[in-house]
Amino acid sequence: WVVTFVAYDCLYYWKHRFGHQWRIMWASHSAHHQSEEYNLSTALRQTSTDYIGFIFYLPLYLAGVPTEVIISVGSLNLIYQFWVHTEHVRRIGFLEWVLVTPSNHRVHHARNPEYIDKNYGGFFIIWDRIFGTFKDEETDRPCVYGVTNQLGSFNPLWANLYVWYDTFLISLKTKRWSDKVRVWFKGPGWYPEDAQPLKAADWQYPSFDPDISNFYKGYSFVQFWVITAVTLWLPSTQDIVSREFMLTVFFWCIFSLYVQGTFLE
């Protein structure tokens, strides 16, 4: 179990690192980084489109590690990561050298140029120290959170699909076939010569904070918890209700999330 936990965390480091360096993986992971706040709710911004991340854990399966052990250590790794998404804990002494902490993970979520593409570790920060991606939090350079291409939306569907859509448009626009493929495996800041962005990435921009009426805030709050309750209830009905009913409720939840995001803008 201990060996698997350490091995899993090392593989997670590489998955996470490629998640920032390949657009095909950044398209999935970007939803987690779009938040311009840094708190426990940021940890809950998980993608719905992580289709290839499992590839990085194949060595564990090939080594014969039981599936239940891999799932267990992966769950522990994920639970630990939840708690480091906070600004209330500053630094925790010598543990900063070994573990992922709120301080060094704040750096990972920052869009300041000096902090970008740093601190990919999940539980141990030693992988970043070994592979040259570690960056300490500097007291005179406070972290500014978010991505360099501001999403500018509270719509959860758009948050999950924006980078996929943008990358697809780039691959259509560029004329070289090699670039049509390359754009998916280059970093999110790379563009073909004939498909440059209309606006350059800029880390300095005001927070997205539209003026929303109290009615829309209240409605969205209630609607969110209704959707959450329905989502938790629906799987328990699979042996009772028809597939058509389940699909109808599922698409209602998706549409409701879209409406909720629209109201908040």
Predicted regions and their residues:
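Membrane-embedded catalytic scaffold of the fatty acid hydroxylase/desaturase
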Residues: 1-152, 156-160
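Hydrophobic alpha-helical transmembrane segments
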Residues: 1, 14-19, 162-170, 194-196, ...
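Hydrophobic alpha-helix feature that most strongly marks membrane-spanning transmembrane helices
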Residues: 135, 186, 259-262
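Membrane interfacial helix-start motif at the N-side
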Residues: 38-49, 201-220
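Helix N-terminus capping/helix-initiation residues
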Residues: 39, 155, 176, 213, ...
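Short, charged cytosolic
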Residues: 17-26, 179-201
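A membrane-cytosol interface segment of integral membrane proteins
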Residues: 142-188
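Substrate-recognition/cap regions that form aromatic- and gly/pro-loop-enriched pockets
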Residues: 209-265
